[in-house]
Amino acid sequence: MAVLSMKQLLEAGVHFGHQTRRWNPKMKPYIFTERNGIYIIDLQKTVKMIDDAYNFVKEEAQNGGVFLFVGTKKQAQDAIAEEATRAGQYYVNHRWLGGTLTNWNTIQTRIKRLKDIKKMATDGTFDVLPKKEVSLLKKQQDKLEKFLGGIEDMPRIPDVLFIVDPRKEKIAVQEAQKLNIPIVAMVDTNTDPDDIDVIIPSNDDAIRAVRLITSKMADAIIEGNQGEDQDDAQEQQVAADKKADSMEDIVEAVEGDNKSAK
């Protein structure tokens, strides 16, 4: 049974690629056609590749894997934080700090600083410090929390990265490659898929598309950890959508209506 139906992907706008002038030719195998200057992603392939990604992530979770969700663009920030947290995993949803993976020991010193300031705030230390010093410490805490809060409790370098828009997150991709950490990613029509281990061809700019696929990766982790099916209702939804739109139907719907396109 497919993890997501073509209808669900269509409703989330997963099929909208970038403008044809902004494409990476290596994504050609995942493109169905072009309409009104926009590439239409082949959702039949996306359905299967989401299944592959889901199974990969679930298996890694069953083996006790640590996952890092990465998405710093505005459209991804909320979904990345919420879904990683729901799955009991870790995230970076603001600027990726160079060396987050390749200089993990240094990053840990900054995380320790964050924890120390938090402790000072709760153990009464702030009450005996000058107001100016407390103000500076709070500013430092806010900055550290913004960039490191999502990995504050990450026990080690992650076993898998899930990335929304690897083109934007190229430093994270490069660091993962150096450390041989597999990458699962939402890959749009303007991105080089060769950098990614487990590809999900998808619109990576629409909030609903990002939320839908990110939530499925979180579901895979939860299912892998629990050793049971995540959502029977989801399977029923996919079954009900089985006779949903073909790619031809989707292209017809797109004709003259690119409101969701970039």
From Swiss-Prot:
One cellular component (GO) term of this entry: cytosolic small ribosomal subunit
Any Pfam family: Ribosomal_S2
GO MF annotation: an example: structural constituent of ribosome
Origin superkingdom: Bacteria
Single GO biological process annotation from the record: translation
SUPFAM superfamilies with a match to the protein in the record: Ribosomal protein S2
UniProt keyword terms in alphabetical order: Ribonucleoprotein, Ribosomal protein
Region annotation (Disordered) ranges: 224-246
Similarity-based family: Belongs to the universal ribosomal protein uS2 family.
Protein's UniProt name: Small ribosomal subunit protein uS2
Organism: Lacticaseibacillus paracasei (strain ATCC 334 / BCRC 17002 / CCUG 31169 / CIP 107868 / KCTC 3260 / NRRL B-441) (Lactobacillus paracasei)
